């Protein structure tokens, strides 16, 4: 299903925050033959004229590179199709954040070896229990982290030191070896059904944590091998930005963020949840059925998604893919949402309304999907008037941006 929530990490086309707006406004733009005149739409106070954000990253270049690294880390279903339940992913912009996915004693190592940035993703073969943030003991679960360092020497040293620190957490920890990856550093605690691993690869350190239902060291090593194979293949397809150029990364080079309807265009800066552009793996990592999500993205020709202040816009390869993406997200919305009539004056829109089985404290009451040529906008609100204005505004902004 598509998680449609008020809080937490942004998941597939999910809004985190919606500003409260009311009133009516006029719409800039021009009529295009064969299309509606967007100047006739009621867009409230939302700005809908063509726009571009400042491209300078300022102090946020590392964060932008971390967002790019969402495509450098493998999804769990790429490791094994049974691991279809995505448990999310996260940018690791600094050592303090990275130790959420490593032993706490690792932070000085990351600082001393000048960690540049990282990314983490996890998944399992079953969903987490309701209200829990960890898999059950009978689940197979995997966490993959890629950490970048200034050079290959720093990465190699960091891998050795991270392994030494991790294995030193308990006197019962023991080293393991991989025949397939003899350079990998593996360890486990006999009788405990999980394994940790580190592998230096070029300027990266790959960190793994694999949980299995049974404490079998040979089985755990085989799963570590499987994960390393998939992750190395994924990393080979990623082109890191040269360290000297990270500060010069553009915030919105394809003007995709500028196509997302927002109440206020001021004071936006790169943020992994509230102001970012992601590729396909980010959406897959949040899916409860990763293979199905991957098929949808492939079938629709999905390219990228931009998130800005609670709304989002996805771009697909050609206009035929936009309704495919809309229908796929509608179908995966889950039982808490029912179809509702969409605004008749906005072509192609489909909307959902929260039903009695939903949680209004966590889920928005209304959500609409707005296709326009190669783009799909997604907007949410708890107010019926606002959702209609916001839907119209998203359509108008997409039309005016071409």
Residue ranges, per PLM feature:
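N-terminal "mature-domain start" segment
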Residues: 25-134, 221-307, 335-342, 390-402
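Bacterial N-terminal signal peptides that target proteins for export
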Residues: 1-12
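Hydrophobic, ordered structural segments
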Residues: 147-150, 162, 195-200, 204-247
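Hydrophobic, glycine-enriched assembly/anchoring segments
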Residues: 8, 364-402
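Short, surface-exposed beta-strand/loop micro-motifs that present aromatic residues
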Residues: 130-134, 194-199, 297-304, 364-372
